[in-house]
A protein has these predicted regions:
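Short, charged/polar surface micro-motifs in flexible loops or helix N-caps
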Residues: 61-65, 90-92, 166-171
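Extracytoplasmic cell-surface/polysaccharide-interacting catalytic and binding patches
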Residues: 1-47, 113, 122
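Soluble non-cytosolic domains of exported or imported proteins
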Residues: 30-40, 89-90, 143-147, 172, ...
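Catalytic cores and adjacent binding grooves of peptidoglycan-active enzymes
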Residues: 74-83, 87-144
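Sec-exported extracytoplasmic/periplasmic mature domains
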Residues: 48-51, 90, 100, 104, ...
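Short, solvent-exposed alpha-helical surface patches in non-cytosolic proteins
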Residues: 140-194
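Solvent-exposed, polar/charged alpha-helical surfaces in well-ordered, non-transmembrane soluble domains
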Residues: 41-44, 48, 93, 97, ...
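Extended, low-complexity, intrinsically disordered C-terminal regulatory tails
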Residues: 44-70
């Protein structure tokens, strides 16, 4: 769903844990901002996965600004459904591989030399631009890491969700142990941890 915001009124409003309305504003300084909630969700997933900040270099564009920068006439940026992003310290190829994993059958993913374009269109589009935009079949390669229960316990310990990993690694958990662990994980997530 695309929502309309005012930079002056809503600029500092958080649309997700790590993104505010202002970050989606047109680079021409206009007040009106269109933002698709699915785009915000996608960007937050990317942010959570890499654990690195994301700079949105271009999101919503007014028609006048889009024409000024020679943007595509039917650009998803005009609809508030697209963002050009830089994930700090992560190569564009790694970002597009993860985006392909998240959106294998829909959405737009464009790989450029120093940024990535993502959009939440219902159809599927993939391209690269190294001087001239060209369509590609996709960006396969990302595989979700499968963790063992021991890996999961180590991760929870390293993130300071639990403080006695050996107790959890023993393998026989009571219902109360599981309930306590779920409460700890829920508290961690609700406090912004990922």
């Amino acid at each position: 769903m695309v929502n309309t915001y005012s930079v002056r009124t809503h600029g500092s409003v958080h649309l997700a844990a790590n993104f505010t309305v202002r970050e989606f504003a047109c680079n021409d300084g206009s007040d009106k901002v269109l933002v698709d909630t699915a785009l915000v969700t996608l960007l937050q997933k990317i942010r959570n996965h890499f654990g690195k900040s994301i700079t949105i270099t271009s999101a919503y564009r007014t028609a006048a600004y889009n024409a000024k920068i020679s943007g595509a006439a039917n650009s998803q940026h005009l609809k508030g459904t697209a963002a050009d992003i830089v994930v700090q310290g992560v190569a564009p190829l790694e970002v597009v591989k993860y985006c392909e994993y998240l959106m294998p059958n829909a959405g737009g993913i464009g790989r450029y030399s120093n940024f990535v374009h993502v959009d939440v269109r219902t159809s599927r589009a993939r391209w690269e631009d190294f001087g001239t935009e060209k369509a590609v079949s996709g960006f396969p390669g990302y595989r979700e890491q499968i963790r063992t229960s021991t890996d999961a316990i180590s991760l929870l310990y390293n993130k300071r969700v639990i403080n006695s990993p050996d107790v959890w690694k023993k393998g026989s958990w009571t219902d109360e142990n599981v309930r306590q662990l779920l409460i700890k994980v829920a508290n961690y997530i609700s406090n912004g941890g990922v």
